[in-house]
């Protein structure tokens, strides 16, 4: 005599100890019964539970391991309406960029600043606003891949800019950039310098620094990655720690001659996931006016 399978409801209730919401337990029960093996229900429910977010201890820190979430942020702001995009002085529409932009620009010694939802978005917005349909010179040694398989050439392609490879993987000189810019077949809108934060080339190497690039007569954009605001770390009584040696900082990169600097706000800055564009006011304004800026703006 063939035994009847348990009801979906009774099987789902027997899985309550797993701690999933009841509708998910019902789904697991239905899948197991449909497969002809009710005993599979607990295995299916446990698989679902493994997909949920749980608290962990990130002993490596957000700089070394962002896959365990960004910096913990204590939300103490009361839940109430705020003047997010409203100018209380004029009674007119305001900008959500105004407050944070002024603060970050001041910290970096920049004319202006804006925030988007991550650093890849910051780079893409800069390229779309300033180099769409034109060439962007990048050293072959800086055409990097960041986490999740996202690559600089692919971000550039989506922006509508054209990648112009310069130099070699291990050695790129100022003369290489100048040669690429001076070619009659190229239309270089800007030079993009990318800090290779997740790898290092050592040995027979040569790098062109920002102060050298600033002599080329084209816009220089530097993506410094992790978001060190000031190499002097004036907020630390003992000065910058030794492990920051070699890490580019926004303030010093701008002082060296970069027109724009992009970086993350969720690593060294310790904020929520975000990306910043800082530098010349006219260039930041051009980025802010681009249609992509609204799509890439951070949530309220």
Please place each PLM-identified region on the residue numbering.
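Short glycine-rich or small-residue beta-strand-to-loop segments that form or flank ligand, phosphate
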Residues: 63-67, 85-87, 137-139, 262
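Short secondary-structure transition/capping motifs
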Residues: 53, 65-70, 89-93, 112-115
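Glycine-rich, N-terminal phosphate-binding loop and its surrounding beta-alpha-beta segment
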Residues: 37-73
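Short Gly/Ser/Thr- and Asp/Glu-enriched loop/turn motifs at secondary-structure junctions
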Residues: 5-6, 57-61, 270-272
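Glycine-rich phosphate-binding segment of PLP-dependent enzymes
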Residues: 29-30, 59-60, 69-91
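Long amphipathic alpha-helical segments
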Residues: 1-47
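Glycine-rich phosphate/diphosphate-binding loops and the adjacent beta-loop-alpha structural elements
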Residues: 30, 34, 62, 268
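Conserved PLP-enzyme active-site core in the AAT-like
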Residues: 92-300
């Amino acid at each position: 005599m063939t035994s009847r399978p348990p009801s979906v409801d009774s099987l789902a209730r027997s899985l309550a100890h797993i701690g999933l919401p009841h509708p998910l337990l019902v789904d697991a029960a239905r899948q197991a019964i449909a497969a002809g093996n009710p005993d599979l229900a607990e295995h299916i429910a446990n698989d679902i539970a493994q997909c949920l977010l749980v608290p962990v201890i990130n002993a490596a820190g957000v700089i070394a391991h962002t896959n365990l979430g960004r910096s913990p942020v204590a939300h103490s702001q009361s839940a109430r309406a705020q003047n997010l995009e409203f100018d209380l002085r004029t009674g007119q529409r305001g900008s959500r960029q105004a407050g944070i932009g002024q603060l970050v620009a001041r910290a970096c010694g920049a004319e202006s600043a804006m925030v988007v939802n991550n650093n890849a978005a910051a780079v893409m917005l800069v390229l779309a606003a300033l180099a769409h349909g034109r060439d962007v010179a990048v050293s072959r040694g800086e055409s990097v891949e960041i986490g999740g398989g996202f690559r600089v050439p692919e971000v550039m392609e989506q922006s509508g800019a054209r990648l112009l490879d310069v130099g070699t993987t291990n050695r790129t000189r100022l003369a290489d950039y100048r040669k690429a810019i001076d070619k009659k077949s190229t239309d270089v809108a800007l030079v993009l310098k990318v800090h290779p934060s997740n790898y290092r080339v050592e040995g027979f190497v040569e790098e062109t620094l920002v102060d050298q690039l600033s002599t080329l007569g084209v816009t220089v954009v530097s993506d410094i990655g992790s978001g060190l605001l000031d190499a002097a770390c004036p907020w630390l009584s003992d000065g910058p720690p030794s492990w920051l040696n070699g890490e580019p900082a926004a303030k010093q990169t701008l002082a060296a001659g970069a027109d724009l600097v992009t970086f993350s706000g969720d690593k060294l800055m310790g904020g929520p996931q975000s990306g910043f564009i800082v530098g010349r006011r006219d260039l930041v304004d051009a980025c802010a006016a681009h249609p992509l800026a609204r799509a890439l703006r951070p949530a309220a």
